[in-house]
């Protein structure tokens, strides 16, 4: 039996037990969530080096970092270094979104190096291979696409991002919608180009039962990619985006009936006042499926600072119910992120996730903050740095100050509020 079947049969699997320990919840809570479809467990049994990660209602908000080969930039060694940096920074998952070069070799390295669940977007490789084989990606055959999907699942990929809900009807709506930025999804735009060139329905939608058969065979989670995500605030929650969400809701139901774990991807650029509505809409139309959001970016003008932009949107979206944040780096809209920007993007997304977990009342999040606050009150710098979301940077900043051995912070020095108040209240920690 696969994970959903086990959960529905009342059986608690080792993966459910592992997730329960990580999350500080009961195995029964995890089992019920998997059975209901409000929790997915990212793991492929063919990978021995991966720790299962739970995503969904009642669990910690998770973060994903994206890497991959793009054009002439970097190489496999560079992307592997980014994976290691993202893992060290605390990402919960890695997405290998390679679009060129030796995609097969890159994926093999990603699966070997990452101890975290790995996701891919098989369409990228299928399009690249079709371009080499037939001279153009628009000549890709259905069989080529499904072959790559199965190869990724068989290789051990833990979750597959697939544009199953981008239908020809939605493409026609988008054509007439008057969007400022008609299409910003890389995979979605290539798929739609194929559909229009061939005058064919999306094969991932037309042959969705075949998608389900592969996912069920390998017990792989499907992540419904969004071809119609808004690329600017003005396009948020327009007809094509909402119609695609309606279709995805129907496919969520079919996936669950087939015993396949599924989550939904969204949304891109969303103004603050629409964040809650966007999440509520997904939860309603997609039957409570876990929501995996890119950003969201709450302004269009933050070039060079989009990791901060995304952290704002991510925190509010996760507070509203989104459970999985796709990181955004400072290089977004400009170029390919370097290792430092990858690390910075993960930390920014983790801060957003943690802020939402606090707002949502998760005990583990609250205790983490309280522990650091106690250490701060006691001027216990070693403990503060260890508890910081980025201990390496916190420690470096502490060491860079001229009086690093002093008890108080550099801002207040001998007038440290913690030290003075503790002295008068008789709560000073004399061992500091």
UniProtKB/Swiss-Prot annotation:
Cofactor names: [4Fe-4S] cluster
**Which EC number(s) does the record attach to this protein?**
4.1.99.23
Could you tell me what the cofactor note in this record states? Binds 1 [4Fe-4S] cluster per subunit. The cluster is coordinated with 3 cysteines and an exchangeable S-adenosyl-L-methionine.
Q: Which GO terms describe its cellular component?
A: cytosol
Q: Which UniProt keywords apply?
A: 4Fe-4S, Cobalamin biosynthesis, Iron, Iron-sulfur, Lyase, Metal-binding, S-adenosyl-L-methionine, Zinc
* Binding of Zn(2+), residues: 269, 333
Q: Name one GO molecular function term.
A: metal ion binding
Q: Which GO terms describe its biological process?
A: cobalamin biosynthetic process; thiamine biosynthetic process
**Annotated binding of [4Fe-4S] cluster, by residue:** 409, 412, 416
InterPro entries assigned to the protein according to its UniProt record, in alphabetical order: ThiC/Bza_core_dom, ThiC/BzaA/B
Catalytic activity entry: 5-amino-1-(5-phospho-beta-D-ribosyl)imidazole + AH2 + S-adenosyl-L-methionine = 5-hydroxybenzimidazole + 5'-deoxyadenosine + formate + L-methionine + A + NH4(+) + phosphate + 2 H(+)
The record's top EC class is lyase
Please explain the role this protein plays, according to its UniProt record. Answer: Together with BzaB, probably catalyzes the conversion of aminoimidazole ribotide (AIR) to 5-hydroxybenzimidazole (5-HBI) in a radical S-adenosyl-L-methionine (SAM)-dependent reaction. Is thus involved in the anaerobic biosynthesis of the benzimidazole lower axial ligand of the cobamide produced by M.thermoacetica. Requires BzaB for catalytic activity, as BzaA alone displays no activity.
State what protein this is by name.
5-hydroxybenzimidazole synthase BzaA
What is the primary gene name for this protein? bzaA
């Amino acid at each position: 039996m696969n994970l959903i079947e086990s959960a529905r049969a009342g059986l608690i699997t080792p993966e459910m037990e592992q997730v329960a320990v990580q999350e500080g919840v009961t195995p029964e809570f995890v089992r019920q969530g998997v059975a209901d479809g409000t929790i997915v467990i990212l793991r492929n049994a063919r990978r021995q080096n991966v720790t299962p990660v739970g995503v969904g209602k009642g669990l910690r908000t998770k973060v994903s970092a994206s890497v991959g080969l793009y054009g002439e930039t970097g190489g496999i060694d560079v992307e592997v270094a980014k994976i290691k940096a993202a893992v060290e920074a605390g990402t919960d998952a890695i997405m290998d979104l390679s679009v060129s070069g030796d995609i097969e070799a890159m994926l093999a390295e990603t699966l070997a190096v990452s101890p975290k669940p790995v996701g891919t977007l098989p369409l990228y490789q299928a399009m690249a291979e079709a371009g080499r084989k037939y001279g153009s990606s628009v000549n890709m055959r259905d069989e080529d696409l499904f072959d790559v999907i199965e190869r990724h699942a068989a290789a051990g990929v833990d979750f597959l991002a697939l544009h199953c809900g981008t239908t020809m009807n939605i493409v026609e709506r988008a054509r007439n919608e008057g969007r400022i930025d008609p299409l910003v999804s890389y995979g979605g735009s290539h798929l739609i180009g194929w559909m229009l060139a061939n005058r064919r329905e999306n094969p991932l939608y037309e042959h969705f039962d075949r998608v389900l058969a592969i996912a069920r065979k390998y017990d792989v989670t499907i992540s419904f990619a969004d071809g119609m995500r808004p690329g600017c605030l003005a396009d948020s929650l327009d007809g094509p985006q909402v119609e695609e969400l309606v279709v995805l809701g129907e496919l969520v139901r079919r996936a669950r009936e087939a015993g396949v774990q599924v989550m939904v991807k969204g949304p891109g650029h969303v103004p603050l006042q629409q964040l809650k509505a966007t999440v509520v809409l997904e939860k309603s139309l997609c039957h409570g499926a876990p929501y995996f959001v890119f950003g969201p970016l709450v302004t269009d003008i933050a070039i060079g600072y989009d990791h901060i932009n995304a952290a704002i949107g991510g925190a509010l979206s996760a507070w509203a119910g989104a459970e999985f944040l796709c990181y955004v780096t400072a290089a977004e809209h400009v170029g390919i992120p370097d290792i430092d920007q990858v690390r910075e993007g993960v930390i920014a997304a983790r801060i957003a996730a943690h802020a939402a977990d606090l707002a949502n009342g998760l005990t583990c999040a609250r205790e983490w903050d309280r522990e650091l606050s106690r250490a701060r009150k006691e001027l216990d710098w070693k403990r503060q740095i260890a508890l910081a979301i980025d201990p390496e940077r916190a420690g470096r900043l502490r060491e860079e100050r001229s009086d690093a051995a002093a008890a108080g912070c550099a801002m207040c020095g001998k007038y440290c509020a913690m030290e003075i108040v503790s002295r008068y209240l008789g709560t000073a920690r004399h061992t500091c």
